[in-house]
Amino acid sequence: MTALPMLCALLTVQQTPFTVGPVTARPGERASGYLGVPAGVDSGTRIPITVIRGARPGPTVALIAGTHGVEVAPIVALQRARAAIDPAALAGTVLMVHVANLPSYLRRTVYYSPIDGKNLNRVYPGRPDGTVSERIAHVITTEIIDRADYLVDMHSGDGNEMVRPYAYAGRLGLDARTDSLSREIALAWGHTRIVIDTERPRDPAASVYTQNTAHLRRKPAITSEGGYLGLADEEMVQHNLTGVLRLLRHLRMLPGAPDPLPAAVYFERTEVVRSPGTGIWYPAVAEGQAVAAGSVLGVLTGFFGDTLAVLRAPFGGVMMYVVPTPAMNQGEPVGMVAVPILAP
């Protein structure tokens, strides 16, 4: 297994306490607390985290939930994973960000921070002197991503979305090992639909996305998706919890035989279809549905029923997610079409 050579080298190193901000976990212990995001040009916040330090050396895996405030299934799953992982049986370290975007979570806002109006997953690696979303990204980059060997950014359907389970794995062509291991951890998580991402930014100073920030630092990373309408439904909570435990067994961080890697369908060409206006959205397709080029995805009307736009598929493919809710702003997504490929 590709992770084993590194792990074998780590086994010769004595395990020591692991500190993230004010949180320190000694070998065989878990510890939780908050990373502070100081006030700056706007109000500050804090980030709830857990450090699980294994009794034996091994890799460090970062698990991030709550980047978007209403994507709650991963948040609940990480709470359960915190209790399920026995530090005495763990090799290595697990870093959990329980809710990356606490302002958005507490205000139940979709996509954007209620403080600065920015999408946290579009401002990485962040800035220490920026607005609150940028400062959150800076803290997560420096305290979590830079400390990890692997990363999973855990997303689900936001309050307006229906998302079939799938993962994004980068293939940026900068480091073959990182590209390959990113696909491997998507499979280890249990994903059977994987979008091969080839168009992310290559500049570490403008990485934009959580996953891409790790990838550009040569840390294998994926974005895990799946869920609907901001619900912590049991199926998606279990999907995420199972993914965590599968990955840790695959990396030999938890005892037990690793699960077989599943067969997967890969997608490369994708397009997010965006609304040309603001009004009431009437979708005509569902997530997972196959569509032909030019087929109707839905109709946007004005507030008095006048048709503003008929949105169509730009090419044939599969709907990876759709927005089934009526409220629609100009420039927001109505869905994403992806084309299956034979091999990554």
Labelled PLM ranges:
Residues L11-P344:
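Structured catalytic-domain cores with a bias toward divalent-metal coordination
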Residues T2-T12:
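Sec-dependent N-terminal signal peptides
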